[in-house]
Design a protein with these regions (language model features):
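Generic secondary-structure signature for well-ordered alpha-helical cores
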Residues: 18, 28-37, 121-125, 149-152, ...
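Short helix-loop-beta connector
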Residues: 123-130, 154, 217-218
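Glycine-rich adenosine-cofactor-binding loop
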Residues: 116, 127-148, 161-166
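Rossmann-like adenosine-cofactor binding region
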Residues: 179-255
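NAD(P)-binding Rossmann-fold cofactor-contacting core
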Residues: 150-174
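A structural signal for isolated positions on well-ordered beta-strands in alpha/beta enzyme cores
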Residues: 132, 157-159, 183
Length: 320
């Protein structure tokens, strides 16, 4: 028995010209189905040193006659370029057939940025139009693209924490959005103290980024994209939301959160989310396979044909 397996490369994904606002819609649509998925915990192996290879499986519910299962394999290996890479294997869950092998790097970045943008939009206090962003590499820019595209109908401001030339490069990347204004802040304490929504895409934080709790004013929403550097907030913020309890429950201060719930319950209307403009809210989104597989399935449906190979499988019982 032979069936065709699509190989979806980065160049094919680029050719789709997917709007970042579409990515925000996709992560919301995926969150809304979270109660109906099967998503076992991530499983990691460590070949050497700090390197890792992690598997992230997820079974999506049936929709319009299709039922997808996928597994994302993500690796961080010292010396590979880029250091962090991922591939997604997408299956037809009804037949068990492998449908596609999808480059996962773009998906990882954009679903991460889209989740942060959706969390900001959902949990920010009323009337906010200013977003303070630090860690302005690829993921930080993905956050900016999603926020800018999702707020096309109004003017917003990005306050950028200066570090090397990252802020200037961020501005250059997003300069074509006519609804976005930019401010570059040099003082770290002022950056935090004046933030209404603080989004950190800092990838490495071996200590607290803002150990002075008084810097976080009432009504602030903090979104640590890589869940690092804000553990002090765990102890005094009014509410904490996470993308998946199985991941967040291992945090050091999980049992000391004042109030905790999964973020998708806010989107479903089961939790009010922000109740007033004084609450300090923390949003932890560790990254879940649900979004990777949802994105891969939508991209597969748009491409399907193209590069690939015929996979020959035994169609009779194998006897030994």
């Amino acid at each position: 028995m032979t069936h065709y397996v699509s190989v979806i490369q980065q160049s094919q994904i680029d050719a789709l010209h997917l709007n970042p606002a579409t990515c925000v819609e996709w992560v919301k649509e995926a969150f809304l189905m979270k109660d109906d998925i099967q998503m076992p915990a991530k499983l990691s192996v460590h070949p050497q040193g700090e390197d890792f290879i992690t598997s992230m499986p997820c079974l999506l519910p049936e929709s319009q006659g299709r039922k997808y299962f996928g597994i994302k394999m993500v690796s961080r290996i010292d010396g590979q370029v880029p250091t962090l890479q991922s591939n997604i294997f997408l299956y037809d869950a009804k037949s068990g057939h492998l449908l596609a092998v999808v480059d996962g790097d773009w998906i990882t970045a954009m679903r991460t940025g889209a989740v942060a943008a959706l969390a900001a939009k959902t949990l920010q206090r009323k009337g906010n139009s200013t977003y303070s962003i630090m860690g302005l590499g690829n993921i930080g820019r993905a956050v900016g693209l999603c926020l800018a595209a999702d707020n096309r109908d109004r003017q917003i401001t990005f306050r950028l924490l200066h570090y090397k030339d990252q802020a200037e490069r961020f501005v250059e990347r997003l300069k074509d959005f006519d609804n976005v204004n930019f401010e570059i802040v040099n003082d770290k304490r002022i950056f935090a103290a004046d933030a209404d929504v603080l989004i950190s895409a800092v990838t490495v934080a071996t200590e607290l980024l803002f150990p002075d709790d008084s810097l976080f004013r009432e009504g602030v929403t903090v979104i640590p994209v890589h869940v690092r550097g804000f553990q002090n907030c765990d102890l005094f913020f009014d509410k904490v939301f996470g993308d998946d309890t199985g991941q967040v429950s291992g945090f050091k201060y999980f049992n000391q959160f004042r109030q905790y719930d999964e973020f998708h319950h806010v989107l479903q209307g089961k939790n009010p989310g922000r109740a007033n403009d004084e609450e300090r809210i923390l949003s932890y989104n560790y990254g879940i396979a649900l979004h990777d597989i949802f994105f891969a399935s939508r991209i597969y449906e748009r491409i399907q044909t193209g590069d690939g190979f015929n996979l020959e499988k035994q169609d009779k019982k194998l006897w030994f």
